[in-house]
Amino acid sequence: SPCQCWGNRRQDHTLKFKNLKMEHKALPLHAHLASLPVYQPGRPLEEVARELGIPFDRVTKLASNENPLGPSPKAVMAMKKAAESAHLYPDGNGYYLKEKLAALHQLEPSQIILSNGSNELIEWIGHVLLDNRSNIVVSQYCFAIYPIVAAMFGAQSKIVPATDFGHDLEGMLQAVDASTKAVFVANPNNPTGTLVNAEALRTFVSQIPSHVLVVLDEAYVEYLEDAADFVEVVRSGAIPNLLLMRTFSKIYGLAGCRLGYGMASTSLVAAMEKVRQPF
């Protein structure tokens, strides 16, 4: 019968595979991955609530700095409207959003790049700058993703001891060497919440050698009443090795949308666009 024939053929194939004498070798993974730990995210809130036997709405996840107020009702309405087009691929270039952001910050659209949260921007920095002969400079209590991404590309992280849980800018400046490709400063800092004096930060940025990318992570800058205006520096082109990172995850309450953006020189944005996935 057809069933018996199929069964016989399947058995023949199984025997052939069993009789194959293959030398199994491990995949040639990048050696530096051996020392790179897998990132361990926090447990789902639903699981924590179930384990503790408490209502879901009584669980607050502090580690991710999520906005407890949630998104604007207008944003919710816009997302509901967008869901009607979920069968279509989105505009990967984010044409209209880039136009709006450019108008807001008085920049050219070519000076703005959209990303899957600011986390993806950090990875693009790795793609365009880092290798196993390079290093980055970070503060002791920095955002964990900076050194993780550096390790992904085989680069070293030069970690400068903190001063009162904040950035020792002079120490970070001294740590820069010929192999340094990027320096990261989050202001306000995540996770310690410290703030670098605006004038001190301006001086620091101006002193970094031109071969080193200065990354100012401004994920929380909208919470400041009187923030230093580094967008003006990007606008003027005075320091072409400057990248500002922003996100819609924090003050706008849109963490689930995974939307961030960078502001930089047109040449740096063009380089990152080359490694940005179109879909």
Protein language model features and the residues they cover:
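Short, Lys/Arg-enriched N-terminal segments with co-localized hydrophobic residues
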Residues: 10-21
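PLP-dependent aminotransferase-like
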Residues: 128-185
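Conserved core segment of the aminotransferase class I/II
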Residues: 238-279
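Structural scaffold positions in well-ordered secondary structure
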Residues: 62, 183, 217-219, 245, ...
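Short acidic capping loops at alpha-helix termini that bridge into adjacent secondary structure
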Residues: 57-58, 108-112, 132-135, 179, ...
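N-terminal small-domain helix-loop-helix segment of the aminotransferase-like
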Residues: 23-119, 124
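Active-site pre-lysine segment of PLP-dependent enzymes
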Residues: 169-179, 191-214, 218-249
